[in-house]
Swiss-Prot record:
Keywords: Cytoplasm, Meiosis, Membrane, Nucleus, Repeat, Transmembrane, Transmembrane helix
Ranges for region Disordered: 1-27, 420-517
Domain of life the protein comes from: Eukaryota
Organism, as annotated: Schizosaccharomyces pombe (strain 972 / ATCC 24843) (Fission yeast)
Protein name in the entry: Meiotically up-regulated gene 70 protein
Any one GO BP annotation for this protein: meiotic cell cycle
Topology relative to the membrane: Multi-pass membrane protein
SUPFAM superfamilies documented for this protein: CAD & PB1 domains, CBS-domain pair
Described function: Has a role in meiosis.
Matching Gene3D superfamilies: CBS-domain (3.10.580.10), Phosphatidylinositol 3-kinase Catalytic Subunit, Chain A, domain 1 (3.10.20.90)
Keyword Transmembrane helix set for record: yes
PANTHER family (alphabetical): CBS DOMAIN-CONTAINING PROTEIN CBSX2, CHLOROPLASTIC, CBS DOMAIN-CONTAINING PROTEIN DDB_G0289609
Amino acid sequence: MTVGTLSVVSSTASDTASHVSDTRKRQYQRDEALRKKIISELGKKSGNFESPVRKIRRNGEPGTVDSAALDPALTVHMQSLVTETAQLMAAKRQNCVLVVDDDEQLAGIVTATDIATRCVGAGLNARQTLIADIMSTSPLCITSDTRFDDALLLMIEHKFRHLPVVSDGGPDGSAGDEGDVIGIINMRACLREPLNRIARQQEAAQKLVEALEGAQEEIENKSVSGNTNSSSVSGNHAAEFLEYVESLKKKASGLEIMSLIDSSEEPFLVGTRTTVAEATESMARSGVSAVLVMDNGAVSGVFTAHDVVLRVLAAGLDPYRSSVIRVMTPHPDCALASLRVSTALERMIEGKFSNLPVVDESDAIIGMLSLFHLATAIEQTPEEEEEVFDQAENDAGIEPSNGFEDQQQQLLGNSNEVVENYDVNPPLPLNPLPSNTQQSESTYEYSARQLPKPPVQAWQNENLSSNNKPQEYVGVENDYNFSNNPPTAMSEQSFHPSVSQKPMDTPENGSNSFAASPYLQPYNSASQLAPSYVGSLPQYHGNPSFVEQALQDLVQPTDSASQIFPLNPQSPSQFTIKYRSIAGRVHRLRLDGINSVSDLRTAVEEREKEQLVTLTYIDDEGDVVELVSDSDLREAILLARRRGLPRLEVRGVAAFTNHLESSHPPISTVDSSIGSASVVEKGVANSIVDIHQPTAKADKGNSKKPIYIGIVSSSIVILAVSMWYLRRKR
């Protein structure tokens, strides 16, 4: 999945500026023309319709809701139609209205998401549905003296972005009657205060890091040279000091949005020809307010609930006949995975959008974040971290001209208490590999402590002494999984349990754990060790032939075992199969529930009710490959792993066997390089993809005969009537 013409948001100031393409400018002009038309129509109906109301600004206490610019409290009656409400929201540039009853009392609240999911997504007719049928009753309100943090926590807890604000009366009654609604506050207004606080904290941490860099280098040099004595900082205090500096560096850099991406939740995708009704139905079913629109494998735009209100219902379009490409927002702004959360929030507040697609370095879509994700991230900062930042502001005033010993004592004296708030145990550095390759007691030795060696099981001794593959595999799950990430530096957690964990389980207590470090030597061959080792892992249990065949194709005889095993295998839930149906709908299937092609076909038939479907995928050479046997599926997964893809994309093609047998010869295939998959040649690939074309031609040829017969019959009838008329006239 690649990105089309999108503007990518990075962490630099120049890239943060919004780059609006010509297409989006034209879309903005059309929206403004539509609003003017709606205002004109509403003015003719009501006679005194006003232009969009500006935000309400009040001189309240700083840090409270009363000091923010509130949205106007638009009200509609319970008996109003959804289309009328959508036109009012579009004309007033609002995404939320309050619903009142006959007594002018607050009865509910309706947002753009409610209209999109509860009305259009539920299959209701917006021209006949009352606003009372889709509103949220008994809305939660806050008073004007509520602080921003409390309002934001309330929004995150209940998962909504708008809160009605009522007056607290004030000491002299100047703020209005107590209980009167004075406006509506949205989540963006509540996020400005936390963003300013995070900016101040990161600035203070950065200043302290700059002040401590010199002391850190001198401590590290003394630790390496062994000159640390009792007159200076002790070894334990030096380690705490270095840990404190590293934690400050992380806090100064900020949290990346990649840490918020859940690999099990992917953005919902629709095609350009998907109707608005189908897209909103998918939004309601998945509980999201936006979907990405794909065109030929690239992101063409984003379709949100705001688009449903403004460009569909307010414009008078039919959701069942309008496609999303007509009303979507083209070329949405995207963010790199390395972007800081605070920077992403600032960009969303500046651009006034609530959904942000996330891309990697290769411009591939890896997820989509909403305001809820980012707001939750900044509000989950523990109080301990805030204490660290407060301490950093005080410590940043230390003069660098002090002596090294005095500076260390002063810094450590101020930071020892805050260091206790952290439960961080970084991996200890590794010593270089020993020169003797025959050493078998400890291939990797840690400088701080000697960790216990795991027990050697019987099957491991047998595998190390023989090149024959074992006949029995031990494990608990039935799945194929192997990481294709580049080799990384080995850490303590790669081979041994941490100090806080229990020692390695033994065969007596029923565990089959395996530690690689004492048994993998630089001279070992990965092709000899990999099948037996990986077959013993829990995630490969129950299907030895599947794992063995895949690893024989993946691991070459010249590969080194020390290069293969440091790879961190992904969990079974991280690799998925995405099926795109004939109609363009996308389904996400879990790999641990699919063990063969028949299981995949069964899953497809359950979701799409398509009996005659040919399953295909695109290989690394761009060929259309048909999935016929289990070996084809195994090879497809293996190719996706080699290419570093987290998923396998499978497409369904209609199999019209009657037309194919009568009008086309059998499809010619060539053998694949691995296994026995059938690769459709490019010459006939188009006939499979556009399989409706020969059917249409055949139907068109057959339809010519009835047309010809009808024309001849009509001519004969007209001629007979003319002759009868002429005879009678004579």
